[in-house]
Amino acid sequence: RSFERHFNERPFLNHACYLFLTKTTKNRNRQQSNFSTLCRGHIIPKEVRDKDTARKFLEATEQFERIMNESGFIRLSRLTDEEIIGTAETPGLIEKYFSLSLSDTTVLEDIDLRADRMRIGDKRLCLHTLSDTEDLPGLVNTDMRYERLSTDRSDCRLSFAAPVGLLLSCNHIYNQYVLIDDCAENLQRFEKNARNMHSLSRYSRSNQINKQWIDEYLNEAHSFGLTSVRCHCNVLAWSEDKEELRRIRNDVGSQLALMECKPRHNTVDVPTLFWAGIPGNEADFPAEESFYTFIEQAVCFFNE
């Protein structure tokens, strides 16, 4: 058939999505980059070793999986132990992450950490982050119109984060973090901050403006019953060629600009965020790299 010949042996983008649900503790959820497990001798908190806590978490995970699969929009399949940690013959997801490769012939490579760069084997890494509300657009949606495949009569809808997903034609990982804290405690902290800003408003107009923003956030949360969460997104791209990496860096910035986000090339936190991105190690995410929002807005940055 002609359409089969058209696609025969044509290059394509190999795309894979993984969703990790990570159980952490209250203290660890607030830790910063200078308190990573890289700096401690014991990496498992005592709260997580409690059997009852682990059982409740697994039950919640199974319920989440069932709800997502029954929705009909997306299908989740749970990874087995062998798929995560690998076997004697095949590498697991963790090995593939450390070598930045999805192939089954993965070879572990040296990791070189420098003040101005990070390298895994011959692969040079560059990182762009969305970790501040000032870098975000004023409005986010679950989907966007893709002009190149849309017409006057029909729309081609893609996810809002598609420009840094399937539409970014280079080797990269797009990470999205949604950190669920105690919502009531978050709102109480914002109430306290608002009072402090009000007290200091006579000394600076910026304090008065900050109080107004905090009040708007609190009003939205209480009026619509929204859950306060923290969010972070980053794009980790790499190349073995130095000149190609420069082009990729520009491409990532351009794709973020298509989402009306402010591209922020991060050269300092690459090792910390790479470490936090290890499958199952999301609890090591540095708290200072996140921004406050609501669940509805946070999931708009998911890539399907």
Residues of each region from the PLM?
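Extended, folded cores of ATP/NTP-driven motor/assembly subunits in large transport
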Residues: 1-301
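P-loop NTPase catalytic phosphate-binding loop
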Residues: 304
